[in-house]
UniProtKB/Swiss-Prot annotation:
This is Meiosis expressed gene 1 protein homolog. Belongs to the MEIG1 family. Residues 28-45 have a biased composition (Basic and acidic residues). GO terms for cellular component: nucleus. Pfam families: Meiosis_expr.
Length: 120
């Protein structure tokens, strides 16, 4: 076993790499898919299926369905006879999957957390 040696370069000891990754993720703006910025925002006051989908998207880090579609494509949904809600999303921050139930998850106590954005 002569002549065999382990060589190489050690990992960098600075925080340079995580900053580069953070910069790549932050290049993406929180605007709508076509670059529009929201002109106003309201909080949800009553539950609807649209509010449910918005709740699921916002818990994954997105402002709107347009923003999600631009990054990952159309989200998977439960069949219409089961409500047609979003069944699986990916997190905006790292791409991990989030699986959602077939029925309502946005309880009344969470309604005020849901933001409805309006674009002109």
């Amino acid at each position: 076993m002569d002549g065999l040696a382990i060589g190489g370069v050690s990992a960098p000891m600075t925080a340079e790499r995580p900053q580069q990754v953070k910069k790549q993720l932050s290049r993406r703006t929180p605007d709508a898919a076509d670059g529009r910025k929201p002109t106003r925002m309201e909080r949800a006051k009553a539950w609807t299926p649209e509010i449910e989908d918005q709740f699921r998207l916002q818990n994954s880090g997105f402002k709107s369905l347009d923003e999600y579609v631009d990054m990952y494509g159309e989200p998977e949904r439960w069949p219409n006879e089961l409500g047609g809600f979003i069944s699986k999303t990916q997190l905006k921050s790292n791409g991990y999957f989030v699986y959602w139930r077939k029925f309502r998850e946005c309880e009344d106590k969470h309604l005020a957390q849901v933001k409805i954005y309006y674009y002109d």
